[in-house]
Amino acid sequence: MVSKISPFDVRSALSTAAPWAAQRLLDRGLLSEQVAAPFIEEDGAQGSSLSRASLAKAVRLSVRMLAQEAPGHSVEVRVPPFVAVQCIEGPRHTRGTPPNVVEMSPEIWLGLASGMITLEQVQAHIDMSGTRVAEIGNHLPVARIS
């Protein structure tokens, strides 16, 4: 049996990773300075570095929280190299490449999971295939932080 993921743990991990994600999204032109500012510490130190373990924890917990809150097997969410889950009710996928896949970078996922950005804002920067992938937008953010 898989243990239930705590929303507190997800918020804590996202809060730790938010400055890093905000700085990366700002650098990529996907986030305005005004939106990024509350997430990036004044000295900028936290925005420039984050341990791989902390990044992995934030990504894994938040993606798994999505799967917990939107159970199912019709859409696969991938955030390489850290995690891939199936979620959203619907036809079950069992072999080969799933028909509905969304794949994105860790910083984009963390921005979506924490409410910094919306799926519509970054749609051109993520790989989406299938008719049901946009349904993950109905379950975002996973945990709003500010």
Specify the residue positions occupied by each region the protein language model found:
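A generic structural signal for short, non-catalytic loop/turn and secondary-structure boundary residues
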Residues: 70-72, 80, 121
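Short, glycine-/small-residue-enriched flexible loop/hinge segments at domain edges that mediate gating
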Residues: 51, 78-80
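C-terminal interaction segments
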Residues: 1-35, 97-146
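Charge-dense, helix-prone N-terminal extensions
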Residues: 45, 63-64, 146
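A glycine-rich beta-turn/hairpin centered on an aromatic-Pro dipeptide
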Residues: 53-75
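Negatively charged, low-complexity tracts enriched in Asp/Glu with abundant Ser/Thr
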Residues: 33-57
